[in-house]
């Protein structure tokens, strides 16, 4: 493979830009954090901050490569967001990981007394859907030294996040697309073919 061919491969998006836009992956909030400034493309007339799709695409690849270092069964995905629950569970099922959707019980990562109740889990890496909604998970992961991958919107703080995926982390279609691409890329890196589509990750209204 020549240098030019390698460059083309690295820059080839996981999804056409039009499909990212159609899913609203780039639509942020009307707030921005200092941490997320480098991922913001522009601000719209209505005050909404717009994320850089190229950065999103690159960070999905980075996150997948990072996660590929871990045993699938030791990857935990967490989401308290309603629209994140179905795609997060689908992600976990597809890669052979663990999922906690809905309420995260305090102590799940730190209190071994919950082990007898089948509530204590010991992942090697955690994926969270929203650093705000999943703040308890992040606090516990930091406490026990577990690396964190997070889907971060324009208003999120990323202080304790090891790998940031800049994205709309509230929209139904956006979350389904992100988890689909993360699944597909992670499986590809492991040499596993998949027939999954973005629609397979999309929860019903």
UniProtKB/Swiss-Prot annotation:
Single GO MF annotation: structural constituent of ribosome
Highest rank taxon of the organism: Archaea
Keywords linked to the UniProt accession: Ribonucleoprotein, Ribosomal protein
The protein's name in its UniProt record: Small ribosomal subunit protein uS2
UniProt-listed GO biological process terms: translation
SUPFAM superfamilies assigned: Ribosomal protein S2
Encoding gene per record: rps2
Pfam families named in the record: Ribosomal_S2
Cellular compartments per GO CC: small ribosomal subunit
Family: Belongs to the universal ribosomal protein uS2 family.
UniProt keyword Ribosomal protein, yes or no: yes
């Amino acid at each position: 493979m020549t240098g030019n061919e390698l460059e083309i491969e690295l820059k080839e998006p996981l999804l056409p830009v039009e499909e990212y836009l159609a899913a609203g992956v780039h639509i942020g909030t009307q707030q921005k954090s200092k941490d997320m400034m480098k991922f913001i493309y522009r601000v719209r007339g209505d005050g909404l901050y717009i994320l850089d799709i190229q950065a999103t695409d690159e960070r999905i690849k980075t996150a997948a490569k990072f996660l590929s270092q871990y045993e699938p069964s030791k990857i935990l995905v967490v989401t308290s967001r309603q629209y994140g629950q179905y795609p997060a569970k689908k992600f976990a099922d597809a890669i052979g990981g663990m999922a906690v959707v809905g309420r995260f019980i305090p102590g799940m990562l730190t209190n071994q007394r919950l082990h007898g109740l089948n509530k204590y889990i010991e992942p090697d890496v955690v994926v969270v859907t929203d650093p705000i909604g999943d703040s308890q998970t992040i606090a516990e992961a930091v406490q026990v030294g577990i690396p964190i991958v997070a889907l971060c919107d324009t208003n999120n703080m990323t202080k304790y996040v090891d790998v940031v995926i800049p994205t709309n982390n509230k929209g139904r279609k956006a979350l389904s697309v992100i988890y689909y691409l993360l699944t597909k890329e992670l499986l590809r890196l492991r040499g596993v073919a998949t027939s999954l589509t973005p629609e397979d990750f999309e929860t019903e209204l």
